Amino acid sequence: MARFPEAEARIFRKLVCMRCGATNPWGAKKCRKCGYKGLRPKAREPRGGGR
């Protein structure tokens, strides 16, 4: 995680489309690329193991 709140806000205050994976601004209601309304906040913790 980031060391200070400004950086954390800059990195994680984004929404990710669950259909195409595009990043969208925080207040978006639908995806800028495909128009899908299913947006999730960007994950704060890594999911994969990387192997």
UniProtKB/Swiss-Prot annotation:
A GO MF term: structural constituent of ribosome
Assembly: Part of the 50S ribosomal subunit.
Domain of life from the UniProt record: Archaea
Protein name: Large ribosomal subunit protein eL40
CC annotations in GO: ribonucleoprotein complex; ribosome
Organism: Thermococcus kodakarensis (strain ATCC BAA-918 / JCM 12380 / KOD1) (Pyrococcus kodakaraensis (strain KOD1))
Cofactor note: Bind 1 Zn(2+) per subunit.
UniProt KW keywords: Metal-binding, Ribonucleoprotein, Ribosomal protein, Zinc
SUPFAM superfamilies, sorted: Zn-binding ribosomal proteins
Membership in a protein family: Belongs to the eukaryotic ribosomal protein eL40 family.
Binding annotation for Zn(2+): 17, 20, 31, 34
Keyword Membrane: no
GO biological process: translation
HAMAP family, alphabetized: Ribosomal_eL40 (MF_00788)
InterPro entries associated with the record: Ribosomal_eL40_arc (IPR023657), Ribosomal_eL40_dom (IPR001975), Ribosomal_eL40_sf (IPR038587), Ribosomal_zn-bd (IPR011332)
Keyword Ion transport appears in the UniProt entry: no
Cofactor(s) required for function per UniProt: Zn(2+)
